[in-house]
Amino acid sequence: MKDCLMSLKIRKNKSPIIITLLLILALFTGLTAGYFSAHGITENGKFEAFSGKVFQNEVSGSTLTLHYTLAHPEKQGIRRKKASLGTVPTDMKNTYQICSQYEKKLKSFRYSRLSTENQLTLDSMLLYYHTEKSLGDNYLLQEPLGPSLGIQAQLPVLLAEYAFYEERDITDYLTLLTTIRPYFRSILEFEKKKSEAGFFMSDTTLDRILEQCSSFIRNPDSSYMLNIFQKKLSEYGKLPSSEQNALLLAHQNLMKTEVIPAYQELMTGLEALRGTGKNTRGLTYFKGGKAYYLYLLQSQTGSYVPVKQMEKRLSRQLSDEIGIAGTILRQNPELLTTLSRGITFREIKPAQMLNALQQKIQTDFPPLTDVTFELRTVHDSMKEYLSPAFYLTPPMDTGTPNVIYINPAANYQGLELFTTLAHEGFPGHLYQTVTFQRQKSSNIRNLLCTSGFAEGWATYIEPYAYQYAADYIQDPSATELARISWLNRSINLCMYSLLDIEIHYNGWTQAEAASFLKAFGIEDSAVVSEIYQYILETPGNYLKYYWGYLSLLDLRTSEQNRLGQDFDLKAFHSQVLKIGGVQFPVLEKYIDAEF
């Protein structure tokens, strides 16, 4: 699964891009001073200069964002600041002012004089900043922490995967470790404001976050960050052993004096707020909760469809797919026996799966030539923190390496591994990312987070992956087994997406959620409780995947109806990939545009 920084399954909630007021004043003073003078500069030139300046300012606002976006920022004319994680703002006034200034400037361009590609970029930027501003007074409902997707859970992974391209990266990494404590202090200030406003997390969620933190700091001398740092230093290969040893000691000391104490301080600060979170149900029970949920859906899924319409579409999809699955099983009752016993899959290694997928997808998707990938196994010390597989997005200035990590702890094999590698690799995240990077689109588009498109695409390709996998299923009913396996996954994702809306928008209690799940054979109280709690803690997360998938599916159906016999599936996929990650209204607008 792909994020703005990397395709990790452990992900933070997106927060608005924040730039200092000083930079904004400098930018807009530059505009009025004639930086974008009309003398000899076309409207396209002015817009590209503006979006380029915005990119430079925003990408340099965070060391992590800069590093994961550009391996060598100096070559792009971007000077690195002192490494820092920054702070979490407790007042969004400046952020909204910036969004308004951006909106005003974007609306000032002569739209008709822009190229189609620049019009698309402008549309996406305008919608992005308008959506961020719509958060309004509900910003305290944002939650940077979480047991699985919170920043305190993701940060160690982001730091562990911090690549060393040059010696400066090593010193920046070590400096970042010293900024965790002030960063966490800013989070605690934010959490205190949430508590005062009545928006603090429930004690159940607090316990789960504290357990995650405890797990990370429990054995500091055997932390996976120590092992990974040593491995990266060795692979960097440009430092003498004496200097490496000195860096290893320095790193170990920073872990004990900075990182571990920062987590301990965070835990102590959160514990002091225990009991102040009174709501144990969905967002709708908070003041402004429904409006905040609408913001989440728009910003995370990239869709602006009304919630009730989403609910109806999901219900129809769930009903349709249950009906299809029932028909298949009635016609092939032996499939149930095979499924309960386990599908027999031909022995094939992960690299062979990815190589085979590159060939098989060419029936339905445009070919992607001259692309390389690396398969890596998740380090033993990181197994419990990472998902079964993930794609690590390369910096935009290098385009490499394209790395897919496999976590042996998940023990994915056969059909499950094949389709997971398709989701992360071909024609999923890796394929979509490389295709878009080769378009050489405006740099700013790499920062406009469009999770709904990215995860929607990687889910949209899964039914094709199950279809390709049928060639490796050792059973006379291979095609039917592959189809019913996809339907099972789709039904589950649809079911959880519906629950997300019911819990956070319509206010379902755990008892109501349990009644719904019982209809699908899920009755174990512990399982029901875990599903309910996970959705409480990650509002909108399932919808990024499944509503994104349905949005692409419905767009394809619309194009089929519009073009009739002239519809070409591969051409449709090519156009979607060419447009790249945008909000769905923008995708729909440009689906038949010429670039």
Where are these regions (language model features)?
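N-terminal maturation segment of proteins
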Residues: 5-595
